[in-house]
């Protein structure tokens, strides 16, 4: 057995559940605020970092939306994405499907093209300079209405070359997937892959709705699926990927102790699970930190860690030929060397 942290570090990884706005570190938030003439409610980077030690969901959301307010120009969005991509490159992340929340910006008067162009330019530079490949997944904010989501989808159509999928995030409880069935149907017709946050705080039937009414290709979170044996059987039978976010679940009190995180039960139930960081700047860890956390808390062995990391590539929306090449590269990188 190699050193656990070293084993995690050398694993090639893909990240499928990362909200790019949630990667905004305090230093960059201050830099962008200064560049755009915005006064933050904190006197220093250290004071802001202390505020990141929140204990309630609302405290997180307040910080999250304040962070969004410093993003004004295409260069701001580029810098945000580039900072994340450079950081995860150092963690041996090879591929990313990056969530972004356009409604959180267009509602502030920021043009859709401003954010989309900045993010796509960063992804292109990361592929060329870092060999980190990535695509965008546009997420609708579920606390807004479906008509607003429809308008956002209209704006996304000009960016189908760079936006791979459509997702659903924000406050889950009280906003079931069924609220968005029409816009998801249209997104599917337009050729987008589909994902949705479901079963994090919301009940298991939200996962059923995401599967049967939205027709998603992947479930984001899905923790509470374990409360419904029939749902677990369905997820296992269909090999439906779940993008699990351990440190996020801990910080938002979805679980009170990582030793009781459902990832272990998911694996034991034969579910197709990936590990991800969600909003890493706010939740205390990027992808490697999430892997190390569950390795320690759940006593995952190297074979399990390897399988979960491989799942990240297998569950991705890469074209089949790219996926086959990525999986072959993953397997060869971990083969014993003579």
What does each of the following model-derived ranges do?
Residues 1-192, 201-206, 213, 217-218, ...:
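Metal-cofactor-binding active-site regions of metalloenzymes
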Residues 197:
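Short HxH-centered metal-ligating active-site micro-motif
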């Amino acid at each position: 057995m190699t050193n656990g942290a070293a084993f995690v570090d050398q694993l090639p990884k893909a990240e499928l559940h990362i909200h790019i706005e949630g990667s905004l570190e305090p230093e960059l938030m201050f830099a962008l605020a200064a560049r755009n003439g915005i006064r933050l409610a904190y006197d220093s980077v250290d004071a802001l970092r202390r505020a990141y030690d929140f204990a309630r969901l609302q405290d997180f959301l307040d910080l999250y939306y304040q962070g969004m307010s410093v993003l004004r120009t295409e260069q701001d969005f580029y810098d945000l994405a580039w900072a994340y991509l450079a950081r995860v490159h150092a963690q041996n992340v090879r591929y990313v499907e990056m969530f972004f929340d356009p409604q959180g910006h267009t509602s502030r008067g920021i043009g859709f093209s401003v954010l989309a162009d900045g993010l796509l330019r960063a992804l292109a530079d990361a592929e060329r300079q870092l060999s980190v490949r990535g695509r965008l997944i546009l997420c609708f904010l579920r606390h807004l209405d479906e008509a607003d989501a429809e308008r956002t989808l209209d704006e996304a159509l000009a960016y189908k070359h760079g936006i791979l999928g459509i997702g659903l995030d924000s406050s889950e409880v009280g906003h079931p997937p069924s609220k968005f069935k029409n816009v998801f149907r249209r997104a599917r017709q337009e050729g987008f892959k589909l994902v949705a946050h479901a079963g994090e705080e919301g009940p298991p039937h939200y996962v059923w709705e995401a599967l049967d009414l939205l027709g998603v290709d992947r479930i984001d979170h899905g923790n509470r699926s374990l409360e419904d044996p029939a749902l677990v059987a369905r997820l296992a039978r269909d090999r439906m990927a779940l993008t699990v976010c351990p440190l996020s679940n801990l910080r938002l009190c979805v679980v009170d102790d990582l030793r009781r995180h459902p990832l272990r039960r998911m694996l034991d139930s034969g579910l197709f699970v990936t590990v991800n960081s969600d909003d890493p700047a706010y939740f205390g860890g990027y992808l490697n930190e999430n892997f190390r956390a569950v390795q320690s808390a759940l006593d995952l062995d190297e074979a399990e860690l390897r399988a979960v990391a491989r799942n990240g590539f297998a569950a991705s929306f890469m074209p089949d030929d790219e996926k086959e090449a990525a999986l072959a590269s993953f397997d060869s990188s971990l083969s014993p060397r003579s």
